[in-house]
Amino acid sequence: MASISWVLNSLFSILLLTQRVNSESTAEKQALLTFLQQIPHENRLQWNESDSACNWVGVECNSNQSSIHSLRLPGTGLVGQIPSGSLGRLTELRVLSLRSNRLSGQIPSDFSNLTHLRSLYLQHNEFSGEFPTSFTQLNNLIRLDISSNNFTGSIPFSVNNLTHLTGLFLGNNGFSGNLPSISLGLVDFNVSNNNLNGSIPSSLSRFSAESFTGNVDLCGGPLKPCKSFFVSPSPSPSLINPSNRLSSKKSKLSKAAIVAIIVASALVALLLLALLLFLCLRKRRGSNEARTKQPKPAGVATRNVDLPPGASSSKEEVTGTSSGMGGETERNKLVFTEGGVYSFDLEDLLRASAEVLGKGSVGTSYKAVLEEGTTVVVKRLKDVMASKKEFETQMEVVGKIKHPNVIPLRAYYYSKDEKLLVFDFMPTGSLSALLHGSRGSGRTPLDWDNRMRIAITAARGLAHLHVSAKLVHGNIKASNILLHPNQDTCVSDYGLNQLFSNSSPPNRLAGYHAPEVLETRKVTFKSDVYSFGVLLLELLTGKSPNQASLGEEGIDLPRWVLSVVREEWTAEVFDVELMRYHNIEEEMVQLLQIAMACVSTVPDQRPVMQEVLRMIEDVNRSETTDDGLRQSSDDPSKGSEGQTPPGESRTPPRSVTP
């Protein structure tokens, strides 16, 4: 009986705990929904009410997902005033980052409930009002950055309540009055470009001049020494009590002479005082003019949009730096496409460690690892001729394309000097690297089933671009076919041709361009089909279209294959790595016929892309998975049906009609 009672009590306790966790999660979820519903935002966060808040973009929970510990929404286009009763209800929050948005108004007083908060980043917004008193009650705060806003009034002495604070960034606001003596263990401190005056307290004098620059009336510490223009000079002995001196020496000076001396001395003093005031006003006017000409934010490093290999930096929670983009980069922000899964901004990209993945005809691709661990690919375009409006219009079209075999555009950036595209990172790499990588003894060959899978999934992606999106790819090649670990592919670098000038002809040695593109310098759906046909030949032969060993100098891959087939040496066409697999000759010949139809020199004789896809799927034989793709087998002793073939089963491939 006692054991039953213990079990019932345990179950009751678990039920109460579960109910409590659910209520806490529901309350925090509702707080976030309240925030999102009352704050307009340019980039849709697409928080699904039916999903757990812990799975939403920018939201991180604790290990058991009972409470929200981090909310990061930098550069997400948030506009307006934070509603009371929203974020202030996230009482377990540790990190809050709303930087680089257009949030305005005063900070809600219920922010004082965020007593567990350690890092608060609100820089580069339009917040106003005096220093929020709610901040001084956040005793666990370590980093506070409210720089580049419109805060006014004095900096309160109660900042000293934040005993754990190591970084305080208040620059580029309208704070005025004297600096309070802040006796905290600050490592980073910045109040530049405000209206502060008076002397810098000794407790803050250890920081560099850059921390205080832009405050004209601030002095002391690392700045100029404080001086008073109204200190009376030591009086001359000749003017000390002249009447007494005269009387002691029994001077014969008359009273009129004494009065004249006093008046003259007063006039000289007034002239000196007027001169000092004139010099003071002149100096102040010059300082104001210099400050007016100084671009804001001053004292903050402006960073060029460059991702050099090996660049790196520490996490936001560690640095808390208030890097301003300034000028054009402030006006041209990173634009996220609809349905994006990322929440970072241009500043994050600039601080990311970067590695060059490759250089192509349209630009250079970098692997960028952001501070929170997210990995993306940043393509830096070159020689873009499109205007900003044309660029943005084309990116809106590209950004709407969603398909499992088309890599999605996540974000883009346009400025006069830089054009950037952001994509998902595919760790398996490209078809080019997999097919033409080192062919030494340590290489794992790409078997036939995986080559068929690559051909089908790439065809599906390209057919979607042509049929559903009505978009010409324009740059199909093996390096633009990216792979998932299961050998499914994603087509990349699509729809970019309209951004570049047609004045320069494509490089014929590239090997993928249709003959008519060399003449018209325009890509079409049929030229895409030609390029895809070259890609199929590449899968079949194992040869790169750029490979010099195709025979005659200047011969391309389609002509080389055609010359071999005409001599009825069809077997010589196929990649030697495929010769170890049995019972696949018929499929290889069928795929070769499809490829040769695609690379017809007459555009009208080429099939449309959806027909190409249908033909490739027909080649795919009986052993299929649920998605219509065959299971891969790396065992060359097994036939394509999974059976061990007899030793004499290999038959010569049938001929291909040119």
UniProtKB/Swiss-Prot annotation:
UniProt: ATP binding residues: 357-365, 379
InterPro entries, per the entry: At_inactive_RLKs, Kinase-like_dom_sf, Leu-rich_rpt, LRR_dom_sf, LRR_N_plant-typ, Prot_kinase_dom
Region (Disordered): 289-329, 619-658
Protein name per its UniProtKB record: Probable inactive receptor kinase At2g26730
Modified residues (Phosphoserine): 353, 430, 637, 640
TM regions (residue ranges): 258-278
Origin organism lineage: Eukaryota, Viridiplantae, Streptophyta, Embryophyta, Tracheophyta
Basic and acidic residues compositional bias, start-end: 619-638
